[in-house]
């Protein structure tokens, strides 16, 4: 299944706020109206919607998300917590959380178009897994700097998660990854256990 490129507001009206997909918010009460129309949701549908929330927020294909679930399942610790850490430490998501892009699709475009450096080296893979002490900057070109500045200026000034720091000097921005993200700083309201459960019942 390919990455979603359809109407974004349609998704947030059904699934709720998806800040990685769009800065728009569903109208107050729209979720309740949708639920009342459809009646009581089955357990399968609840699990499916949590999985879809995760997929659309982080901008993943079905195959990509399944791969992350499998990697998390083989790691030590809670599969759900490890899954969220893997997704949050992707380069495209780190750029979004730093405010250097207004959405995750926007961050992915910055990476694909070769505007982003990690530790001084060009990285054009949005799924690149960032590590503690990574330094994220832009290429020393006017266009690269201007794109980041536009995102910084237009972004909602939200508190940065504790695992990240953003420094600025004369329109040059430098993001620092201080540590692996703590689960309480994940940028999406999600029940990750339902996502793991969804996939465990598919096998």
Swiss-Prot record:
InterPro entries: Ribosomal_uS4, Ribosomal_uS4_bac-type, Ribosomal_uS4_CS, Ribosomal_uS4_N, S4_RNA-bd, S4_RNA-bd_sf. Part of the 30S ribosomal subunit. Contacts protein S5. The interaction surface between S4 and S5 is involved in control of translational fidelity. It is found in: Plastid, Chloroplast. CDD domains: S4. Belongs to the universal ribosomal protein uS4 family. This is Small ribosomal subunit protein uS4c. Residues 15-43 are annotated as: Disordered. It comes from Illicium oligandrum (Star anise). One of its GO terms (molecular function) is rRNA binding. The lineage of its organism: Eukaryota, Viridiplantae, Streptophyta, Embryophyta, Tracheophyta. Its main location: plastid. HAMAP family: Ribosomal_uS4_B.
């Amino acid at each position: 299944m390919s990455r979603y490129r359809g109407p974004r507001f349609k998704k947030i009206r059904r699934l709720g706020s998806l800040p990685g997909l769009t800065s728009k918010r569903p109208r107050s009460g729209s979720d309740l109206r949708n639920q009342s129309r459809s009646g009581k949701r089955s357990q399968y549908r609840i699990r499916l919607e949590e999985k879809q929330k995760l997929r659309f927020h982080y901008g993943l294909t079905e195959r990509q998300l399944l791969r992350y679930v499998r990697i998390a399942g083989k790691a030590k610790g809670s599969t759900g917590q490890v899954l969220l850490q893997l997704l949050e430490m992707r380069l495209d998501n780190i750029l979004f959380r730093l405010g250097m892009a207004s959405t995750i699709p926007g961050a992915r475009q910055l990476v694909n178009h070769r505007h982003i450096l990690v530790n001084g080296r060009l990285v054009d893979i949005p799924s690149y897994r960032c590590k503690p002490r990574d330094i994220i900057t832009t290429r020393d070109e006017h266009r690269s700097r201007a794109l980041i500045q536009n995102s910084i200026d237009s972004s909602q000034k939200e508190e940065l998660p504790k695992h990240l720091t953003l420094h600025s000097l004369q329109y040059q921005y430098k993001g620092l990854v201080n540590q692996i993200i703590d689960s309480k700083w994940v940028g999406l309201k999600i029940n990750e256990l339902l996502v793991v459960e969804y996939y465990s019942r598919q096998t």
